[in-house]
Every structure is written in C-alpha cells, then in structure tokens.
Amino acid sequence: MEDNSVLNEDSNLEHVEGQPRRSMSQPVLNVEGDKRTSSTSATQQQVLSGAFSSADVRSIPIIQTWEENKALKTKITILRGELQMYQRRYSEAKEASQKRVKEVMDDYVDLKLGQENVQEKMEQYKLMEEDLLAMQSRIETSEDNFARQMKEFEAQKHAMEERIKELELSATDANNTTVGSFRGTLDDILKKNDPDFTLTSGYEERKINDLEAKLLSEIDKVAELEDHIQQLRQELDDQSARLADSENVRAQLEAATGQGILGAAGNAMVPNSTFMIGNGRESQTRDQLNYIDDLETKLADAKKENDKARQALVEYMNKCSKLEHEIRTMVKNSTFDSSSMLLGGQTSDELKIQIGKVNGELNVLRAENRELRIRCDQLTGGDGNLSISLGQSRLMAGIATNDVDSIGQGNETGGTSMRILPRESQLDDLEESKLPLMDTSSAVRNQQQFASMWEDFESVKDSLQNNHNDTLEGSFNSSMPPPGRDATQSFLSQKSFKNSPIVMQKPKSLHLHLKSHQSEGAGEQIQNNSFSTKTASPHVSQSHIPILHDMQQILDSSAMFLEGQHDVAVNVEQMQEKMSQIREALARLFERLKSSAALFEEILERMGSSDPNADKIKKMKLAFETSINDKLNVSAILEAAEKDLHNMSLNFSILEKSIVSQAAEASRRFTIAPDAEDVASSSLLNASYSPLFKFTSNSDIVEKLQNEVSELKNELEMARTRDMRSPLNGSSGRLSDVQINTNRMFEDLEVSEATLQKAKEENSTLKSQFAELEANLHQVNSKLGEVRCELNEALARVDGEQETRVKAENALEEARQLISSLKHEENELKKTITDMGMRLNEAKKSDEFLKSELSTALEEEKKSQNLADELSEELNGWRMRTKEAENKVEHASSEKSEMLERIVHLETEMEKLSTSEIAADYCSTKMTERKKEIELAKYREDFENAAIVGLERISKEISELTKKTLKAKIIPSNISSIQLVCDELCRRLSREREQQHEYAKVMRDVNEKIEKLQLEKDALEHELKMMSSNNENVPPVGTSVSGMPTKTSNQKCAQPHYTSPTRQLLHESTMAVDAIVQKLKKTHNMSGMGPELKETIGNVINESRVLRDFLHQKLILFKGIDMSNWKNETVDQLITDLGQLHQDNLMLEEQIKKYKKELKLTKSAIPTLGVEFQDRIKTEIGKIATDMGGAVKEIRKK
C-alpha cells in the first residue's frame, strides 16, 4: 500500500481556506464581511416576510451605501491586481531582454576565443607546412645524392674490376723467370729439411699474389671513398645553407605581407601566385605548387575575415564610447531637488536609490568595456596598455589620456566620476558606425525611464506652483521637503512586498497628542514636515475627538491584521516550496520504479514462461505500469496544488496592499478639515501615516451631506407611511402599537444619522479614491503603452541580435569546417611526413651499412698493411737467399708450372663435382619429401571421403530409424559441420539406446505379467473343471435346497478375487511420487542452496504433493469398489486392456520426462539467474530505500 498522507494533507487545504474563490477579481477580504453579508441577507428576508422592525427599516439605505462601498472596493482591488500584473510583465520583459543581451555577449566572447584558436592553429599549420616543405626538399636531395652515389659506386666497382684485371696481367711474367727462380730456391731450401717435400708451393704463392692485389685494390677503394665522402659533405653543407637562406627570405616575405608593407606590390602581382626560391624545378612538383597556392588563398581569406572582425570591434567600441558620453552628459544635467512628491509610488529618496543602482550597473558595464578595449587592443596588435592605446586609438576618442587613471580609480571604488571630452568629428564618426554588436537596451531603457519620471516630476511641480488654494493662505513651496519615515514605510508595499515584509509601526495614541496641544495653547504652531512653515496650526475641536479615537483603533487593528496576514503568506510560500520538494521526490521515486520494472522484465525473459514465479513477476510489472500511469495524475494534482498556493500568495499580497491603502485613505480623510481642530488632527495623523495631498475646503462636503441626510429622512418617512398604510387600513386597533413603533423609529433615527453620515463620508472618500485610481490607471495604461513600444523596440533589437548571432554561428560553422579540413590536411601531411621519415630511416640504415662496410674495409686495410710490412721484411730476406738458389731452380721451373696447372685444373673439377653432388643430394631429399606429402594428402583425401560416405550412410540409417531428418548437413571442406553431424548422431544414438532399454524393461514387465495371467488362467480353468465335476455330483432337486446356496456362497467367498492392474498402478505411482517428494525434501534441506532455488524446489514439492494426494484419492476410490461384483473378463480382453494401460503408462512417462526436462531447465536457469541478478536486485532495492529516505528528509526539513 502506498502512503498518500501527503496528498491527503494537500487535499485538505480547500477545507481550511473556506469557500473556493471564483476568480481573482473577487478576493475574500474578510471573514467578518461574510457574516455581515449573511446578516444583511437575513434582514432582507425578514423585511420581505413581514417582520416590520424599526431598526431594519431604517438600516436599508445604510446597507445600500455599504454595498456600493463594497463594489468600489472590489473595483479597486481589480485595478490594483491589473496594475501589479502589468508591473510584473514589465519586470519579466526587462529581465528577459537583459538575459538575451548577456547570452549574445557570451556568444560574442566565444566567437572571439574561437577566432584566436583558429589563428593559432593556422600559424601552427604554416609552421608545419614549412617544416614539411623543408623535409621534402631534404629528402629529395638525399634521394638524388643516394642515386648519384650508387651510380658512382657502380662505376668505381667497374673501374676497380678493370684495374684488377690489368694488375693481374701486369703481375704475370711470360717467361716466368723471377717466379721460377723464387720457387726453386724455396723448394730447395725446404727440400733440405724435408726429404718428403713435393712440388706444391706454387699454389700458396698464387694465394699470396692474390692477397697483395686485393690489398692494393682495397687501399685504392678506401681513398676513393674518402674523397667521395668529402664531396658529399660539401654538397650537404651547400644545400643546407641554400635552404636556410630560402626559409629566411620566405619568412621575411610573409612578415611583409602580414604587416601590409607589400600592399601595392601585392595588388600589382597576380593572385594565387607562389614565390619560387632556389632551384624549384628540382625540389617541387606541380601538385605541391597548386597546394601552396590554395593555402595562400585560404590565408588571404582568413586575413580578410580578421580585418572585418577588427572593423566590427572598432565600430562596437565606438558605439560604447558614444553611449558612455551620452550617459555622462545626462548625469551631469540631471540636477533635481529632493522633494517629497510621489511619482508612480516612489519618493525622491527612492528615485535617488534607483539612480544609484543604475550608476552601479553603468560602472560594471564600464569595467567590462575596459576589459574589452584591452582585448581589442591586444587583437589589433597592441600591448594591452590603455594608458598608451586609449589616447592614440580611435576606440576611446571621447576620453582624454589624463583621465585614464581617474577612470580606473572610479571603477575600482565604484564611483561615478569619468570626464569625457566630446569632439564633434569623433561623434560624427561614431554615428556613422551602425553595427549592433552589443545590446544596450538596458541602458537605454534606464535612460528613458529616468527621463519620463523627470518629466512627470516637473509637470506635477509646475501644476502645484500654478494651482492656488482657496481655504489656506499659503501654498506649497516649489521644492517640497521629504515625507516622514512612517509615511514612506506605509507606502512601500508596492516595492517587493512578498520578499520583504513591512514593519508597521504602531502610531501614538491620539488623545495624548490632543492633550499636549491643548496645554500648549493657541499661539504655538505644529511642526509638521508635510506643511509649509507659513501656515499656522489651529486647535482641535471636542466633537472630532471620538472620531479620531475610532480612527486610531482602526489603524491599530489593521496593523495587527497585517502582521498576521503576512505570517500566513510566509507559511503559504513555505508550503509552496515544500510542494515542489514533494513533487521532485515523487518524480525520483517513479523513475526508480521504471528502472526496477525494466529489471523485472529482464528476469522474466531469463526465467521463461514455465517458471511458477513468472505470473507473479507479470503481476508486479502490471502494478508498476499502473503506478507509473498514476504518476501523471499525481503530478497533475501537485501542479494544481502549486498553482492554488501561488494564487493564495498573490491574494494575500493583494489583501495586504488593500489594507495598507485603506489605512492610508482613512488617514487621508482627516487631513481634509474646515476648521482648526481638523487641521490639528491632520497634523497629528501625518506624524505617523501622513501621505501628502492637496488641501481643499470641507464646508461644501458638509452641506452636501446635510442635504443628503434630509433627503434620506424624507425618504424614510415616505417609506414608513407607505409601509404602514396597509396594516392601518386593515386594523385600526394597532394604531397605538404603530405610534409606539414610530416613536422608537424617531429615536433610532438620530442614531442612524450619525452612521449614515459616516457611510456617506466613506462613500465620498471611496469615490475620490476611485477617481484617483482611475487616473492612476490611465497613467499606468499610458506607461504601459510606452513600455510596449519599448518592448517592441527591444524585440526588434533582439531579432537583429539573433540575426547577427545566426551570422556568427554560420561563421563559426564555416570556421569549424575550415578547421576540420585543415585537420584532415594536417593528418595527410603527417602521414606523408611519416612516410618520408620511414624513407629517411631506410636511407640512414643504408648509410650506416655503408659506414660499417667502410669501417670493416679500413680495419682489413690496416691488417693487410701490417701483413704487407711483415711480408716485405720476410721477402727481403728471402730475396737475398733466392738469388743464391735461382740457378738451381731454373731447370725445374717448367716441370713445376705444368704440374701446378694440372693440380689447379683438378681442384676446379673437384669443386664442381662437390657442388653438383650437394645439389643432387638436396634435390633427392626434396623429391622424397614431396612424394611423402603427396601420399599423405591422397591418404587423407581417401580417409575423409570414406568417413564422409560412412557418416552419410549412418545418418540415413539413423534418420530412417528415428523417422526424423538431421538438422546439420555435412560440408566436405568444413570440419565444424562434420563435428556437428557427429554430435547429433551421438545424441540420436544415445536417445535410441535409452528408448530401447526402456522398451526392453516394459516388454519384460509385460511378459512377466502375461506369464502371471497365464498361470492364473490355468488355475481358473482347473477350478472350473473342479466345479464342473462337483456339479455332476449334485443331489436331486428338492433335497437340501436350503443348504445349497450356502455352499455356493462359501465357494465364491473362498475363490481368490482378481487383482486389478490399475489399482496396482495407482499404488505404485503414489509410492513413486512419495519417493520423489522425499528426495526433493532432502535436496531442499541441503546446505549451499540459493534462496531462489529453494523457492522453486518448494514449489515443485507442493505440486508433487498435490499429484500424490490426487493419486491417493483415486486409489481410495478404487478400493471402495465391491470386488464381489467385479466381472471376470477373458484373457484377450485383459490383454487388450493391458495394452491400453501400457499406452497410457507410456504417455504418462513421456509427460514425466517433459516435466523432468523442464525441472532441469529451471534448475539450470535459476542459479545463473540468482548469480547474475542478485546484486542488481540488492542495489535496486537500496536505491529505492535511499530515494524514499531522502525524500522524507527533504519533506521534514521545514
């Protein structure tokens, strides 16, 4: 059940308030008034019914005047409500216009920041573009150098090969004299020490010669490579110097175009042209030139837009300076006297306060303008120092440079001193700029409001100076002093009455003032701020003292009633705030219910329709949906309650204002006096409630009232005679009673005259008040027309601002698109840079590889030089020795050379044979491996085909056996399909095996039962034969007739009855279900079970118990059957019944299997459901509890 106590509390508010109000134009002003209206209706009914009391007859005109006064009061309240409504609309329109201006300014600042970001990104893009161009040029130069180096390396290689050949030719001796003698000497020397020496040293000598040639060639290569490296370094230095020069020239050209130095040259040049610096034909292509031209056009467009934005800023700041100049002149010229005139419910002090607020707002705007000027100066290229820029630039054309410090001090301290030096030429320039970048409607509206109020003040002042008073000798001064403190406080109800309650000061008792004035004497003058000092204050007459006392009581009671009414209004506002809190809390709760409903839907989908908890969850879902639908009704009720509370607060405010105005009107009546006492009483009343009005003579009013009283007397006499004619004609005996009544009526007439006079006075005052309110309403309507004009102008300005905003948004979108395109291009450039970096890395790797080769060559060169030195030393020694042995070796040199040639030829042939043998071995191994792979592939294909054929045959046989086609099909190239088919076949085979096992059990049971039945049949046949044999031995008829039936009955009782298989089946089924129940109980009591699983097992236990009870009841019913009347059927009939029962048993077994499968599914689904959703359900319940607790805390705060 939901707790609707809060809603019941809200619904009881109507009973507390009383009768419902029909409209805002009929406020319930007073509970006593309702009693009076009821009393007046009752008196009218008594008059109509014939109860002719003298008091009721004489009170009829008073009632009419009271009703007229009531109607006038209702009209006054209606007019005041309309006035408040129009004031509220004006304030709302003013706030809306100010909000729009702020939004436009925020958008403008965002645009400026976005423009700065775009400029920064454009500069970054330019730098990246320059870096990219430099990298491209470097990469191209490096690629060219690399290609040239490769060509040079190839040429050097070719030259080295030719030189090696030439050296080999030059090194070989045709006659072989030196080499032969050298070899002979070596052989001889070695042969002395080694007797087994053979002529094989010529091959080693050839190796030495080859090494020497290679050493010389490597030395030459190293020298050439060093020369080439020096040349490449020189070229790289020259190219880097050229690139640095070209980048400096380009930067200078761009700086010149940005500063406008090359304006004339740029106009003369062709647009979309590109500067060609250096050797452009080698480093740049046509695509790069077109790309650079597009970038230059975009840069030119961005510069144009930047110039437009700067011009717009300049025009905007010019307009701001012009407005400040006008406001300064207005403030300087607006010198007015502190008078006590009431202009639209505001005194001069209040006007000064409002002007101070306007000046404060202007100071804030001035500070913002100063910040904007600094920002503009920075955007235009300045340093942001206003001391220099404000005096030189045309943005602050109206402010002198000497006054900047005073401006800053005024802005810091909140002062209003800023000297503006207007110049005619600069004002003309300011009038030419017409770009509305900032909405100045608030300042203009304040200016217009101040001007209209100043005109009203001057007009009222002139009218008061021209108007001459008839009764008083003096007149008001041109500059009136301000009113008293109490008067201003009593009429501050029109200024924010709801937020700040009025402190009603209790006025002094009037009789004390009268006594003090009587004791002072006639020569003293009453010091009152509301009168001029020329008029003397007369004394108070004794006849007006009770009226003054009544007036004092009325004012005191109205003050007390105001305090209570204000407390009630505060309570209503608190209730309204609490209603909003209740509404927010209910919204949060309903949203939480939505999320919990979604959670229950997921649980229902997971559990399925077979679960017993599904129906409960569906019911909960329906309950959630109904509660969510009820949310709309509850929210509507809360909205209506909030509206009613808002209307109550408005009615309370209207009531307070009406009471204050009545108190003011009551005090006003006593300021109009014809004699000295009234003047004195008015001076006393003005001490506490004195609104300042114009004095007029009161004698004409008194005469009019006396005439009205005489007319009312005549009307009363005529009505009395007219009403009393009918009873006098009918009954002459009542004349004495009528005379008594007339005497009483004449006695009461004097009393009614005083009340009538008071009512007439009230009527006259109300009429005058109504006329004044109508005049005020006329003024308000005129002001409303002006306000509407201002609003239309503000709307037009707002439309213009919206258009500018739309333009700015379009510009922003274009800038964003430009930025996105630039980002895309930047990404492409980054990709190209990464590609170039990869190429550079490859080139660096190749350079490093070459350097490593050079280093290895240098190391080998050093080693070869060392070896050459050692060999040269050894050769010198050997040459000395060989000279001695040359003669001995000459004759054997020819033989040695031939043998050496043969050996070399044989070695080459051996090498060729070894390589051919290695290749043959490799090919043979490859061939064997390939043959094995082919055989394996064939074996696999045959095996797969045989397996697929076998699987197809097995699947066909199984489908024929089960009479069901397989869902999965075999795809030869897909292993997963074969696995699926195998799984399905296994499943089918396991199923068939289980069914065959079950069939075997059933057939075994059937065979056993058939055997039992056959045995029983044999027994029955034997018994029948025995009975037939006994019947043959029956005694004749007539003898022992009475004893025969006893024997037959005993025989029947002795025969065994037929045991029904249905009874046995019921017994076995009940026992089986009981065993299931016991097993489920054991599983239910096991430890480690989840709560949801326990619930499901409990439900299954209950259902199985119901099934057990049902079977047990059927068994009891079957036991109650009389077995004596059981029909002994034949064996064939029993077999057919057994077959039917067997079929029924199979159907029941299938159903039990289905139930078991569903139970397994629920068991498998419920634990996963609990594991997945347990935490979510806990968190959901916790969130609901926290939301409800938070809502209750918020509601109980106040």
Curated annotation (Swiss-Prot):
Signal peptide: none annotated. Residues 67-381, 566-603, 694-916, 983-1035, 1127-1175 form a coiled coil. Residues 1-45 are annotated as: Disordered. Keywords: Cell cycle, Coiled coil, Cytoplasm, Cytoskeleton, Developmental protein. One of its GO terms (cellular component) is cytoplasm. Residues 1-10 have a biased composition (Polar residues). It comes from the Eukaryota. The keyword Cell cycle applies. It is found in: Cytoplasm, Cytoskeleton, Microtubule organizing center, Centrosome. One of its GO terms (molecular function) is identical protein binding. Plays a central role in centrosome maturation and mitotic spindle assembly during the first division of the zygote. Required for the centrosomal localization of air-1 and zyg-9. Probably not required in late embryogenesis and during larval development. This is Spindle-defective protein 5. It comes from Caenorhabditis elegans. The lineage of its organism: Eukaryota, Metazoa, Ecdysozoa, Nematoda, Chromadorea.
